[in-house]
């Protein structure tokens, strides 16, 4: 890849296959609508396909959930876990769940943050990787 200034425009794609390169549990500085404490999976995501010339690039994304570890199936985090892990979307600890995500793929639309500066996985577009797309992941 070389060295130099990285691409400054956020990655966008209508439908991309994305691989979780890294995931860790961190405390969120935000609270939910009921003012409950939250945690997040802080992830580094690599675009495998679907973003044209931006394929192969990585971006950071945070998936929030209640600090208690309750993760609803319709939340963005729940959709990620179900798409990437399927029936294996559970663990003894949050850290174990985060480690299970590493190396897994899922499909989703990539949009931008509200300010337009950062790439973001779009809620309600997250799904398992189509079998034909998974075969193309030789990284």
Task: Give, region by region, the residue ranges found by the protein language model.
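Short beta-rich binding modules
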Residues: 1-139
């Amino acid at each position: 890849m070389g060295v130099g200034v990285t691409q400054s425009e956020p990655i966008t794609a209508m439908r991309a296959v994305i691989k979780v390169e890294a995931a860790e549990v961190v405390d969120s500085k935000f609270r939910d609508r009921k003012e409950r404490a939250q945690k997040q999976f802080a992830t580094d995501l690599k675009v495998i396909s679907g973003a044209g010339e931006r394929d192969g690039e990585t971006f950071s994304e945070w998936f929030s959930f209640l600090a208690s570890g309750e993760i609803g199936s319709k939340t963005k985090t729940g959709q990620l876990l179900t798409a990437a892990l399927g029936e294996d979307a559970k663990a003894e600890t949050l850290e174990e769940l985060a480690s299970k995500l590493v190396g897994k793929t899922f499909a989703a639309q990539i949009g931008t943050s509200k300010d337009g500066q950062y790439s973001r996985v779009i809620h309600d577009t997250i799904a398992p990787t189509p079998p034909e797309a998974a075969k193309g992941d030789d990284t």
